Amino acid sequence: RLYVRGLDQLDPVPVPGSDGGILPFFSADGQWVGFRQGNRLVKVALAGGPVTPICDATGDTYGATWTSADTIIFASDSGLMDVPAAGGIARVIARPDTGEAFRWPDVLPGGRAVLFTVFARGTVKLAALDRRTGAVKRLQQPGAYPRYVTAGFVVLSDPSGIISAVPFDARRLEVTGAAMPLADKVSTASDGDRNLGVSSSGDFAYQANPSAGSRLVLVDRNGAARNAGSDTGFYYAPRLSPDGKRVAVARWADINFATRDVWVLDLVQHTRTRLTFD
């Protein structure tokens, strides 16, 4: 389920009808939120109402942006697609070359161009699509998940989770200066996704990488929590045994999430046993 929380509020509010929703994006006026639900893109008004289908999305999707002209542009394995926000059949507007992948679009003010990320041969760089001509301009600026700020900057994130701002000429679609670091340790994924949101005015919110790791806890029906006997680490998908006496859990070796193994925690004997060594 998706949630919305005002930056001046402490409590998130569930988005109605968003069960199973992923990859959310706001409409240009901020009154609607679109997202992927199952094998389709849908939208719902934040004020309430039914979930409305936009288009089929049977393959993977990698981010979407909603233009002021009420068109939605999203990235797929076929390239950049667009579809009316009112619903319809999506069409390809930019195809990647062999060995490339297009990800994480962001429309520029006025809708004339779209920024996005190009993955190619181990590199991650900024690119721009001129919607009037259909031409793709591959820039040499490293970085993923571009977000344009009306003051004339593009906010980018690198694979290590550092957020930077680069001066950008939105008319010429050119980077005009050096990158300036803004923050680091942003939670990232291998496909370039970032737990990062940027407003047009330049305010941004992000989720930091859990560099210190976490501990497993047990929570009873009354909400009381106690340590499950784990040390600090990077855990994934814990499962309780039927008798409730043991926990099986995957644990990554470190923050790079390169390798992981399965461990079993004995909640009675307070012991830990490693089952795999891959």
Q: How should these model regions be labeled?
A:
Residues 1-278:
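Acidic, proline/glycine-rich low-complexity intrinsically disordered segments
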